[in-house]
Amino acid sequence: MLSSHCLKKHNHFHCMRLGPRPAIAQDIARLGSAGFVTEVANGVVIFCFNAILLRLAGDVGVAAYGVTSNIGLVVAALFSGLSQGMQPLLSRERGRRHDENVAQLLRTGLFTCLGLAGVMYLGLFAGTDAVVAIFNSEGSAQLAALAKPGVRLYFLYLFAGGTNMVLSAYYSAVGQAGRGFGIALLRGLVLIVPMAFVLSHFFGITGLWLSLAVTDTAVLALTLLTRRSSRR
């Protein structure tokens, strides 16, 4: 279907020979760095969580994390879709210097994010037994005992974590890629890994489940503090 458009004589798209443009490639890499860090960090975090759970609870602990991580993929996709949907709109309004529209889009994105987080967390909290049962076909009581509190504690991160994802996308879209990269790096790698080891050392599996929520809350607090200080 697309080729038929290109073959028509009355179109404005033509093949052109273009050489490499390092400046453009650099801009693309800079603006996409936050997303890159997020994707790479996911693998590192999963590895660390599995290693800690294997030490604390054996194979059953790893299976319990499998429940939360699989649900987390769906949840992250929703926040990622929201963030990616905002970015072109934010960039357009920023380019037009419509600062009021940029602020309105950010507010709408944040309210939508918190609404999604609230609905998803309430759904997971109320339906924990049913959700865990989907992944516990053998009816293991040990797996259920680990996974049920895991779901309820792990997904407390939705509120601060979703907000961080929206803010990271916002900064990348309005030309402040450094801040967006900083949020992604802190929440995805720099803080979460040591936080997981420290909290699991002192509070066991409960500390591990809470490590993501604690990390995202700390990153959000730091982001809001730096945002406020930059306005002064």
Segments from the language model and where they lie:
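Core transmembrane alpha-helical segments of multi-pass membrane transporters/permeases
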Residues: 23-52, 85, 117
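Short runs within selected transmembrane alpha-helices of multi-pass transporters and secretion channels
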Residues: 1-4, 80-83, 154-173, 179-188, ...
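Hydrophobic transmembrane alpha-helices of secondary-active solute transporters
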Residues: 34-42, 50, 76, 80, ...
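Short alpha-helical transmembrane segments in multi-pass integral membrane proteins
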Residues: 1-33, 90-156, 198-232
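Hydrophobic residues within alpha-helical transmembrane segments
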Residues: 33, 37, 41, 68-71, ...
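Small-residue-rich hydrophobic transmembrane alpha-helices
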Residues: 64-122, 126-128, 161-179
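Alpha-helical transmembrane segments of multipass membrane proteins
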Residues: 47, 51-52, 74, 166-170, ...
